UniProtKB/Swiss-Prot annotation:
Keywords: Cytoplasm, DNA damage, DNA recombination, DNA repair, DNA-binding. Residues 143-153 are annotated as: Flexible linker. Residues 1-63 are annotated as: Domain I. This is Holliday junction branch migration complex subunit RuvA. GO terms for cellular component: cytoplasm; Holliday junction helicase complex; Holliday junction resolvase complex. Belongs to the RuvA family.
Length: 202
């Protein structure tokens, strides 16, 4: 099994990363969290989970071991496949997700597209005792009021963009994560520009 890949990053989208190692290019599935970590980088090391099926060999990549561990824990839950696990990790940063599971916030997990209440509750029941937080819940909640949140609260275009993206069928947590990131870089963007950029990330 592949533990990690290290080499030149030759392609990067919100869902996939192509990394060249010893002349071979590997197509790796990634979350928005990992995508953000490798933006602008020409080289990198990515931690790998390899899934072998009859019809395909799939690689899932993560910028940290912590995110990879969460991916493995999520896919161990009945009803949560790798695609759904990646969507959950795209909606919440690892520490945020760990806090939601530890504190039993099923409604927040249910907001992720494809996750129903029963599945959200199952994730909490199965993983609550396995999640180890390196920071307290208070620190995590405090972090969620940083620059991105301030931008959403003060700029009307951010809320308009969120509403429009919801109408397109995207999940609220993933939308807010994308829009916060966009506005933290440029808070003067018009609604249509925010939406266009968010669509490239969702």
């Amino acid at each position: 099994m592949i533990e990690y890949l290290k080499g030149a990053i030759v392609g990067l989208t919100p869902t996939n990363l192509v990394i060249e190692c010893a002349g071979v290019g590997y197509d790796v599935n990634v979350s928005l969290t990992t995508y953000s970590a490798y933006q602008g980088k020409k080289e990198g090391l990515i931690w790998i989970t390899q899934l072998i099926r009859e019809d395909a060999h799939l690689l899932y990549g993560f910028s940290t071991k912590e995110e990879r561990t969460l991916f493995g824990q999520l896919t161990s839950v009945s009803g949560v496949g790798p695609t759904t696990a990646q969507l959950i990790l795209s909606s919440y940063a690892p520490q945020e997700l760990a806090a939601l599971i530890t504190t039993g916030q099923a409604d927040a997990l249910k907001a992720v597209k494809g996750i129903g209440l029963k599945t959200a509750q199952r994730i909490i029941v199965d993983l609550k005792g396995k999640i180890q937080l390196e920071t307290s819940s208070d620190e995590i909640l405090s972090a969620r009021t940083a620059v991105g949140d301030a931008a959403l609260n003060t700029i009307a275009s951010g809320e308009e963009a969120i509403s429009a993206l919801k109408m397109l069928g995207f999940a609220d947590p993933a939308i807010r994560k994308a829009v916060k990131s966009i506005l933290s870089e440029d808070s003067s963007l018009a609604v249509e520009d925010i939406i266009k950029r968010a669509l490239r990330m969702l």
